[in-house]
C-alpha cells in the first residue's frame, strides 16, 4: 500500500491555505505554557471554570504551568514580540481534561486567528469568516452569527452553518478582541481587532460525516485511506 496524509493534516493545511490567501501569516508557540499566557493575558477571571483542574492539565503544583487549552496563547506571544498591525493564524494541538466521547478528546487540533489594525469592525470579522466558510464548505452554504460569551472578546459570537438536513450547526467561536487583552500586551488604544477559533476535528467530522472523534486517532488504515 502507498502512504497517506492524515485527514487532520489535510484539513489543517487547507484551512491555513484559505487564510493565507487573504494575507494571514502562520505563527507557532509552545504546547507547555504559562498560566499567564493561557488565562491572565486573555482576560480570563480567576473564578472562570476553565481554570479548574477538572478542565485544565497543569504541570506543577502551583498551577503556573500547563498544557495549553487553546492556541490563543500564540496570539499573546506574537503580540508581545511584534508591533501592530497583526494578521496571523495559529494552528496546533491543545489539551483539556475532557473524557473521550463521540465529539470530545483530551487532545485535539485547533486553529485560531487574530487581526489587529486601526478601524477594524465586526463587519470585517463577519466578512472574513463568511469567506472562510464558503471556501471550505462551498459557496452555497448559509451562515449566521449568534451572540455568545468568551472572556477575551466582546462582543462575542458563534458561527453556525445550515447543514443539508436544514439543521444549524455551530462550527466556530469569534468576537472583537477585548481592550483588556490589547492593554496586557501594551498595544496602543488606537488599535482594535478580532479573533476566532475553530476545531479541526469538528470541521473534518462535518465535511466527511465522521460520527466519532476516536476514528482520527486509531490509525486504522481502512479509515485513513478514504481520504
Sequence positions of predicted segments:
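TRNA-recognition modules of translation machinery and tRNA-sensing kinases, especially anticodon-binding
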Residues: 2-227
Amino acid at each position: 500500500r502507498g502512504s497517506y496524509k492524515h485527514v487532520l493534516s489535510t484539513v489543517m493545511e487547507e484551512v491555513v491555505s484559505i487564510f493565507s490567501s487573504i494575507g494571514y501569516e502562520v505563527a507557532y508557540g509552545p504546547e507547555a505554557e504559562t498560566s499567564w499566557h493561557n488565562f491572565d493575558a486573555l482576560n480570563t477571571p480567576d473564578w472562570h471554570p476553565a481554570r479548574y483542574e477538572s478542565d485544565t492539565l497543569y504541570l506543577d503544583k502551583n498551577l503556573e504551568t500547563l498544557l495549553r487549552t487553546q492556541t490563543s496563547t500564540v496570539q499573546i506571544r506574537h503580540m508581545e514580540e511584534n508591533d501592530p498591525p497583526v494578521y496571523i493564524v495559529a494552528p496546533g494541538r491543545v489539551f483539556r481534561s475532557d473524557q473521550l466521547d463521540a465529539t470530545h478528546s483530551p487532545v485535539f487540533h485547533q486553529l485560531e486567528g487574530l487581526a489587529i489594525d486601526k478601524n477594524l469592525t465586526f463587519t470585517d470579522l463577519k466578512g472574513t469568516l463568511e469567506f472562510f466558510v464558503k471556501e471550505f464548505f462551498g459557496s452555497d452554504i448559509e451562515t449566521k452569527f449568534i451572540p455568545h460569551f468568551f472572556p477575551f472578546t466582546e462582543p462575542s459570537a458563534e458561527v453556525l452553518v445550515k447543514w443539508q438536513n436544514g439543521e444549524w450547526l455551530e462550527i466556530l467561536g469569534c468576537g472583537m478582541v477585548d481592550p483588556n487583552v490589547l492593554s496586557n500586551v501594551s498595544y496602543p488604544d488606537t488599535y482594535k481587532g478580532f479573533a476566532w477559533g475553530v476545531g479541526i476535528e469538528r470541521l473534518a467530522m462535518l465535511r466527511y460525516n465522521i460520527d466519532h472523534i476516536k476514528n482520527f486517532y486509531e490509525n486504522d488504515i481502512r479509515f485513513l485511506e478514504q481520504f
